[in-house]
Amino acid sequence: MAVNYGSKRVVVGAHYGLRDWLAQRVTAVLMALFTVVLLAQVLLSKGPIGYDKWAGIFSTQWMKFLTFAVIIAMLYHVWVGMRDIWMDYVKPVSIRLSLQVFSIVWLVGCAGWAIQVLWRL
């Protein structure tokens, strides 16, 4: 009895499962840590929280970079979830591809907008 392993094996489907599950967990942890850092800065600051305080928190380059890294992580987190929804629930390939392309364009636009907001371009 011959066993057909290796390069002749037929694999069906995308099989993103474990990688995407891990990616969403890593991005979720990164977003949670960012929330803790942001809350610590807000809670440890003296005086009322106003525009000047918020602008001061996000004025340093390391905070801008950290915020942008978290935004990119969140956009990837969103992409994995939306792609899974489109793949699971939208059966016509043309509609699914259109929705995926629209999602990518929208998320890239959100990243560009985040750059404009953070660095006031």
Whereabouts are the PLM-identified features?
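Membrane-embedded alpha-helical bundles that constitute the cytochrome b-like, heme-associated redox core
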Residues: 1-121
